[in-house]
Amino acid sequence: MMKEETPRANRFHIGLFGRRNSGKSSLVNMLTGQQVAVVSDVPGTTTDVVLKNIELPGVGASVLVDTAGYDDEGELGGLRVKQTVNAARRVDLALIIVSGLPDGAEKEKAWAERFRADDIPVLYIYNKVDEDGGSHADAWRMTLGATEVVSVSARTGEGRDRLLSAMAEVYRRTDEVEELT
């Protein structure tokens, strides 16, 4: 079945979650090879959940779910976070995007716990490796207590193949569990 023929509900949903300006929308653009999401240096550019159908190697027909930052503020920010929470309930894989130095990873840990409580696998993605050579990825890994943090640059495409491989591995594990039940 071609990706255009696969109903959206039957696709593998991959959610991108993180703080404002962590590069979620830029990652959507990098993964699709298209400018489908608006990006800027202004925090809070993504105001609504954006869905993008994509065919991923090793996964097949999928949907990328781009969300507003979970640290958004103010009255409108609260509404955007509510949409992000609703989107989180409908994903099959959560990518938690981080960048820069770990500045109190409480939000990231809380979101990871939320996903795990719902049996949703989590991949930590360190974005903007082009800005610091990835020197902070290990600090994030240790702070989060993660076995792995996939380092990427949405701007240059560095790490794209590793990210695709990591997502395909999670998909395979998820698919194996579904076949057993």
Regions inferred by a protein language model and the residue ranges of each:
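Conserved G1/Walker A P-loop phosphate-binding module
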Residues: M1-G78, Q83-A88, T174-T181
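Hydrophobic beta-strand core positions in alpha/beta domains
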Residues: L16, L64, I97, Y124-Y126, ...
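Short alpha-helical
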Residues: S22, T45, D103, D132, ...
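Solvent-exposed alpha-helical segments within well-ordered globular domains of core cellular machineries
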Residues: N29, K52, S62, K82-R89, ...
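Hydrophobic aliphatic residues
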Residues: L31-T32, I54, D71, V98, ...
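A short hydrophobic beta-strand->loop->alpha-helix junction that borders the nucleotide-binding pocket
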Residues: D41-V42, T67-A68, S99-G100, V152-R155
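Conserved Switch II/interswitch segment of TRAFAC-class P-loop GTPases
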Residues: D72-E73, A88-K109, D119-S135, R155
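Canonical P-loop GTPase G-domain recognition
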Residues: I120-L123, K128-T181
